[in-house]
Amino acid sequence: PHDSSLWVPDWIKLHPSIENESLKETMQWGSKGQIDGASYNWHKKNDKFWEQLYEQIPNMKQLYFAGGEATIIEEHYTLLEEVVKAGYAKNIELRYNSNGVEMPQRLFDLWDEFKNVRFHYSVDSIGEMNDYIRFPSKWDHTVKMFHLLDNTGPNVEVTVACAVQALNIYYLPDFVKWKLEQKFKKINLWPLGA
């Protein structure tokens, strides 16, 4: 459950069934059993953090969002809006590593305000294999997001960030073939990759 709140329900069920006490202690979550999701919401009640972050907007050159799926977190949008409101967006590059779970028009409208956006789209295969590796993603939705990203503004660069692994190694040629057949205008253009 350290890496994803989606694992918390499974952890609640599985952890009590571990019989080896040494293993059970080793596998204990860092917050010593607090598996209610509270550690994923530390930012919700931390006004001082947000005040200090907003004070730094004039000094920012880049904001990098990796993990936690920024595109589904309201505070991500609030931060981007604060940067735009402060008048510094054209000086700042945005970077993302994301599986593109949700990308509303609001996001693309905000991106238009920034100097540059580099979106590294985490996709590891096609079809059912993608759905399995990137659960709970659905391939049809992933394809839709590919096309939305391919039609973003000129300040947006998009690359596919594929994690080569045992589950997809034999399917990578199919993935590359599919991607090339799409004839995307901007996704992984040379020299960024094929």
Model features per residue range: what roles?
Residues 2-47, 57-74, 84-106, 112-144, ...:
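Core AdoMet radical
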Residues 49-53, 79, 106-110, 138-149, ...:
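A general structural detector for well-ordered alpha-helical segments in enzyme core domains, enriched
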Residues 166-182:
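Catalytic cores of alpha/beta
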